[in-house]
Amino acid sequence: MIGKLKGTIDEIGEDHVVLDVHGVGYVAHCSARTLAKLGRAGEAAVLFIETYVREDQLKLFGFLSALEREWFRLLQSVQGVGSKVALAVLSTLTPGELANAIALQDKTSISRAPGVGPKVAVRIVTELKNKAPAFVGEMAPSIGLKQELGEGVAAAPVSDAVSALTNLGYSRDQAANAVAAALKNGGEGADSARLIRLGLKELSR
């Protein structure tokens, strides 16, 4: 089982990278985000590896962080999500953005990934909503947001507020954190317009 590879980039393809490790070229399939962050041919690179062994093939998937690899594994625990769809989701959303989308029940953001229709997006949100908080690191903001949401807070106004703040130029994590703070500071039960105002107030501090 291969867990990690450190070597020199030989070539970067549309959906994979060939990593030269002591003269052996390993083909690792990666998300578009990972490929975009890799250096050029001839430069050093380190990839966390997920190894798939089938009767007729051995396939490697490469990630820049262990967290991204864990998300790849977790996504495939959802019915109807295979390696191709999991990589498509990770090509569209960072681990932090994906965690926020699940916490916010934001199916629209997840369905932006190629090959992810509304039904699959619903399953991802539904099946992972209780598993996602087990992760740490980049996902910490979304965990806090999920705790602020609780069971009695309507998801739609929260999702709309985060989307609006994102459209104003803030990153998704900034927007999610601002809305979480707004909920904590008296915004529970507020409509999207009020959450946007409170969120902007938090961002201006």
Curated annotation (Swiss-Prot):
Organism superkingdom: Bacteria
Gene Ontology molecular function, alphabetical: ATP binding; four-way junction DNA binding; four-way junction helicase activity
Keyword DNA-binding: yes
Broad class of where this protein is predominantly found: cytoplasm
CDD domains, per database record: UBA_RuvA_C
Region annotation (Domain III) ranges: 153-205
Region Domain II: start-end pairs: 65-143
Pfam families, alphabetized: HHH_5 (PF14520), RuvA_C (PF07499), RuvA_N (PF01330)
A GO biological process held by the record: DNA repair
UniProtKB keywords: Cytoplasm, DNA damage, DNA recombination, DNA repair, DNA-binding
Oligomeric form and interacting partners: Homotetramer. Forms an RuvA(8)-RuvB(12)-Holliday junction (HJ) complex. HJ DNA is sandwiched between 2 RuvA tetramers; dsDNA enters through RuvA and exits via RuvB. An RuvB hexamer assembles on each DNA strand where it exits the tetramer. Each RuvB hexamer is contacted by two RuvA subunits (via domain III) on 2 adjacent RuvB subunits; this complex drives branch migration. In the full resolvosome a probable DNA-RuvA(4)-RuvB(12)-RuvC(2) complex forms which resolves the HJ.
Entry text on domains: Has three domains with a flexible linker between the domains II and III and assumes an 'L' shape. Domain III is highly mobile and contacts RuvB.
Family: Belongs to the RuvA family.
Free-text function comment from the UniProt entry: The RuvA-RuvB-RuvC complex processes Holliday junction (HJ) DNA during genetic recombination and DNA repair, while the RuvA-RuvB complex plays an important role in the rescue of blocked DNA replication forks via replication fork reversal (RFR). RuvA specifically binds to HJ cruciform DNA, conferring on it an open structure. The RuvB hexamer acts as an ATP-dependent pump, pulling dsDNA into and through the RuvAB complex. HJ branch migration allows RuvC to scan DNA until it finds its consensus sequence, where it cleaves and resolves the cruciform DNA.
Name assigned to this protein: Holliday junction branch migration complex subunit RuvA
Organism of origin: Sinorhizobium medicae (strain WSM419)
Gene, per the UniProt record: ruvA
